[in-house]
Every structure is written in C-alpha cells, then in structure tokens.
C-alpha cells in the first residue's frame, strides 16, 4: 500500500501550522496581550501569534459546529412543537498532566464567549470530581490520583447528563491545588450555559476501556466535540519538572500548601522528586489510561518545544 493510499485511509485531516493558520479566514483578534498573559499557565509561552494561528481558527471551526448543532435542535423543536430547553454544547479537552490543557481551555472560553452571538461559556475541570483525600486514603489510592479509579465517576457522569437533559441548575465540586483536595461545601452552580468546556485527564474514556462492564455510561457519551492536546513524552517530562520547580519557588512556599515541604528541597532534590512523581504516577497514567484514548478525539493538537502547536489533526 502506498503512502498516499495510507494517508487517504486515515480518519483525520492533517494540517501543518501554516495550513491551519490559513483557516482563520478574517476572524478578528479579540484578546489583548495582557489578557493572553493572564490566560497562560505557569510554565507556558502563550503568544499573540499562537492565539491567532492556532486558537482563532479553532474557535471559528467550533462556532460553525455549535451553530449547526443549534439549527438541529431547532428542527427537533419544530417537529415536536415544543419550546426548546437550553441544551449546552459540550467540548471536552483531554491530555497528559503538564501538556497545557488548562490554558487551551481558558483561551477557548475567552474566544468563544466573544463571538458576535455572545454565547455563555462555562469551564469546569474534572479535578473537582476526584474523590476527597479521606476516601482515597481509605481505598489506598493517594498515589493513583488522576487515574480513572480516583474519580467519583457516577457524580461526573450525572453532572454532564443533567446538563444535556436541560436541568437548569447543576452543581459541580471544586478542587483546590493549594490543599490538594476537593473543597468541602465549595460547589459551583452551573446555570444553563450555551457552551460547557470540560477539561480533564480521562474525559475521552469510553466503554472500550471497560470491556468487563459493557453497560457503563461515560462522559464521552455526552460530549459534542473532543480535543486531545498531545506532545512527545520527553517534552511532557521536561514541562512537568519545570512546572514542579516553579511551584517549589511559588505555590509550595505557602504554609497552607499541601506540598509545603517540597519548598525546602534543594533544586537537585526537587528535580529528583519530580522525576520520581512523573515516572511512578503521571507517566504511568498517561501510558495506561490517557494516551490510548487520543485517537477518539475530534481534534488533536500536537505541540513542540515552547508549547507551540506544530500540527493539527481534525477528524473527517
């Protein structure tokens, strides 16, 4: 089989950076450099150019999909003779720890909310749906945080199911990275958004990952468009270690931080600790649970050095 034939058989359209940037068309930049600086993560270089060449074309594509979805809802309402409920369009963002999912989510939230339609965009991270530390300790799962079994999947699925069912007020638990735990009584109420962005490690999992439980319902069953943020493993490890070092000098210095003791480490000790955490927890989770879901995404953003997206793959 020729390379051309193999290319034609892929379920994805592939764009290099320049090809993707051309899809921006005439969409105006709606974010200032100061706003972009506030949106980026602790260890990322997010430039005006990156937003213009990668995220503006993506927001344009998503706006087309969302408008199409609304038209389809209107057809159903016309057929049934009903007044429509506000059913949000759900976008999920998956990928490894340290790949930049949160930044992608925040940028898309800002861009999508500034389209002329003025749609209301909510952002929820699945961290809030982790079991509280007390439960994880009882189950021996503290070193498995972020693995599928560490989440209250029933509550997470009910959350997205309620939103898709038109429930007007839905609550989501909130996670604090300072205390490394779910905030007691800190729930956030989500009130009928037009768009919900759901960001998390395992949001692309499906029944294929649980063949022993074929009747399981998953978050992915309710998602309209899914994004996987990808990068080579060596870069992910480097980004994770660099982020850990920055936390050591910043967030970890807070006496209330769960990881306050890490602030006392020397740089060499901190690098060694970060590498151990990466290999024993985050790399393992990536290989076992996250990476196998990549090819299910509607769109894959592949990053190179400096968190710059070098390739985009869009499912046909």
UniProtKB/Swiss-Prot annotation:
Pfam families, alphabetically?
Answer: PRK (PF00485)
Residues passing through the membrane, by range: none
GO term, biological process aspect, one: coenzyme A biosynthetic process
Q: Give the E.C. number(s).
A: 2.7.1.33
Query: PANTHER family in the record, alphabetically?
Result: URIDINE KINASE (PTHR10285)
Which molecular function term from Gene Ontology is one that the record holds? ATP binding
Quote the pathway field.
Answer: Cofactor biosynthesis; coenzyme A biosynthesis; CoA from (R)-pantothenate: step 1/5
Reading the lineage from the top rank, the first entry is Bacteria
Q: Could you tell me which HAMAP family the record lists for this protein?
A: Pantothen_kinase_1
Q: Where is the protein localized?
A: Cytoplasm
Q: What is this protein called?
A: Pantothenate kinase
Provide the Gene Ontology terms for cellular component.
Answer: cytoplasm
Positions of ATP binding: 95-102
Q: Of which family is this protein a member?
A: Belongs to the prokaryotic pantothenate kinase family.
Alphabetized, the UniProt keywords read: ATP-binding, Coenzyme A biosynthesis, Cytoplasm, Kinase, Nucleotide-binding, Transferase
Cite the InterPro entries for this sequence.
Answer: P-loop_NTPase, PanK, PRK/URK
According to its UniProt record, this protein's enzyme class is: transferase
- Catalyzed chemical reaction(s): (R)-pantothenate + ATP = (R)-4'-phosphopantothenate + ADP + H(+)
